[in-house]
């Protein structure tokens, strides 16, 4: 029986990991912060020895060094691969003019989405520090995407760059809107800011989905992922599917392809 793969998704806000067996089933998973101040280190002591680590890192060199230190402490000399977007991989063709410019997290997510929803046209919306959209045709062609500030970043920008508007977190904003979602307009400043930025997210998604369906002359499945997906979903008027495991699933496919090639 082959050893499992350790999968690591180092995003802008936190680091998620999973252990995938030979059937690409995630048998263990967790999350931790970029620094020790962000919470405890992952406890990998009970995990079986993986054959290697497959890493998507969009968080920079400091996080890469932290990951190396954690891996070396648990499994010295463990082989590790930091993935990069390619022109084509695992059934997905990259439509970027410079394929390597596409973030590794978005690339892994596209591969995961292609496997999760085969033979379907997809719009994948991920709500993190940034809100990203990817258009993926049923034949596996990624035709392009959009990047916008995330919900939290929108609200933080308004609070930081204006004199009288508050700086709100998504937790606070979500609570403010919990009793006000039926109202299209709000009657105080914190709720107006929370709802305005949330509707900006929803409006972007709905416009992109309608434009994509019109351009392709076919139905498009809207797939939502990320920390703010629940809040944005409640503001949407379009049908949608929630799937938060696309990046790790994509990493599992990339790891399996690499192991088969080796």
Swiss-Prot record:
Q: Which Gene3D superfamilies match?
A: 3.30.420.40
The record lists the catalysed reaction(s) as:
(R)-pantothenate + ATP = (R)-4'-phosphopantothenate + ADP + H(+)
Where does the protein end up? Cytoplasm
Show the GO MF annotations: ATP binding; pantothenate kinase activity
Could you say which residues bind substrate here? 96, 103-106, 189
| The protein's annotated pathway | Cofactor biosynthesis; coenzyme A biosynthesis; CoA from (R)-pantothenate: step 1/5
Q: Which cofactor(s) does the record list?
A: NH4(+); K(+)
Q: Would the keyword Lipid metabolism be found if you checked this record's keyword annotation?
A: no
Q: How is the cofactor bound?
A: A monovalent cation. Ammonium or potassium.
Q: Where does ATP bind?
A: 9-16, 129
Q: Which GO terms describe its biological process?
A: coenzyme A biosynthetic process
Enzyme nomenclature, EC number: 2.7.1.33
Asked if the record carries the keyword Kinase, the reply is yes
Q: Which EC class is this protein assigned?
A: transferase
* Keyword annotations: ATP-binding, Coenzyme A biosynthesis, Cytoplasm, Kinase, Nucleotide-binding, Potassium, Transferase
Catalytic residues in the record: 105 (proton acceptor)
| One GO CC term on file | cytoplasm
What the record says about family reads: Belongs to the type III pantothenate kinase family.
- Function field: Catalyzes the phosphorylation of pantothenate (Pan), the first step in CoA biosynthesis.
User: What assembly does the database describe for this protein?
Assistant: Homodimer.
Could you tell me which HAMAP family the record lists for this protein?
Pantothen_kinase_3 (MF_01274)
Q: What is this protein called?
A: Type III pantothenate kinase
> Organism, per UniProt?
Burkholderia vietnamiensis (strain G4 / LMG 22486) (Burkholderia cepacia (strain R1808))
Q: Which gene encodes it?
A: coaX
């Amino acid at each position: 029986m082959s050893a499992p793969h350790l999968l690591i998704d180092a995003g802008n806000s936190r680091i998620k990991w999973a252990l995938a067996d030979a059937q690409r089933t995630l048998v263990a998973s967790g999350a931790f912060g970029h620094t020790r101040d962000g919470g405890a280190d992952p406890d990998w002591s009970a995990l079986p020895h993986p054959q290697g680590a497959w890493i998507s890192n969009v968080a920079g060199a400091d996080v890469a060094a932290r990951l190396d230190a954690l891996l070396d402490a648990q499994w010295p000399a463990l082989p590790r691969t930091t993935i990069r977007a390619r022109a084509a991989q695992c059934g997905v063709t990259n439509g970027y003019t410079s394929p390597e410019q596409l973030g590794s997290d978005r690339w892994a997510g596209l591969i995961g989405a292609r496997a999760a929803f085969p033979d379907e046209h997809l719009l994948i919306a991920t709500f993190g520090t940034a809100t990203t959209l990817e258009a993926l045709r049923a034949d596996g062609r990624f035709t392009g995407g959009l990047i916008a500030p995330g919900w939290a970043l929108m609200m933080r920008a308004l609070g930081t760059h204006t004199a009288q508007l508050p700086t709100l977190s998504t937790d606070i904003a979500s609570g403010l809107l919990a009793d006000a979602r039926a109202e299209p307009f709000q009657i105080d400043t914190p709720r107006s800011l929370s709802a305005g930025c949330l509707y900006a997210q929803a409006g972007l998604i709905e416009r992109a989905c309608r434009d994509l369906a019109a351009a392709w002359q076919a139905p498009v499945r809207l797939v939502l992922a990320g920390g703010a997906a629940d809040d944005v979903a409640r503001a949407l008027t379009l049908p949608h599917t929630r799937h938060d495991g696309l990046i790790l699933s994509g990493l599992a496919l990339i790891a399996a392809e690499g192991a088969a090639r080796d």
